């Protein structure tokens, strides 16, 4: 599984466009892809065809409330899965800064994906790629994304 973070401190440089199009192109090539939206604006979520206001769970629930990441995964109409974001992620740095090992929370959540139990006797196929769309800042969220990448 390759984990890629699309990051830049400057806004408006195409991070979200790159992340969504990369996820879509990989899915089109029959790769199993998970897109993680780590920006409170939720533009990757919206660009993936979802309404960020209607998410049952978001990446904020995973990072701040310890929700297992697989419970926040939603299928998109574009052939890839997403863990969406919304404004619940705003101000998350303050909450994350109070957690132990706050730089590795996303990494631990992704390790849960690798250790997913079998359902109905079938082991779920692991993701070929995880693409992380970062906010335009060097925050604890971006640090989590960088620590979660595969190289």
Question: PLM ranges: what are they?
Answer:
Residues 1-151:
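P-loop NTP-binding core
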């Amino acid at each position: 599984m390759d984990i890629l973070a699309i990051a830049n401190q400057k806004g408006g440089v195409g991070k979200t466009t790159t992340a969504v199009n990369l996820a879509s192109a990989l899915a089109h090539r029959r790769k199993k892809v998970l897109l993680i939206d780590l920006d409170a604006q939720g533009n990757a979520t919206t660009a993936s065809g979802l309404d960020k206001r209607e998410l049952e769970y978001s990446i904020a629930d995973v990072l701040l409330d310890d929700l297992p990441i697989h419970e926040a995964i939603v299928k998109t109409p574009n052939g890839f899965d997403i863990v969406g974001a919304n404004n619940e992620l705003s101000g998350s740095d303050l909450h994350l800064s109070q957690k132990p090992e706050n730089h590795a929370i996303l990494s631990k959540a992704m390790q849960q994906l690798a250790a997913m139990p079998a359902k109905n006797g079938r082991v779920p196929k692991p993701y070929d790629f995880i693409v992380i769309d970062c906010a335009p800042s060097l925050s604890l969220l971006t640090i989590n994304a960088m620590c979660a990448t595969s190289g």
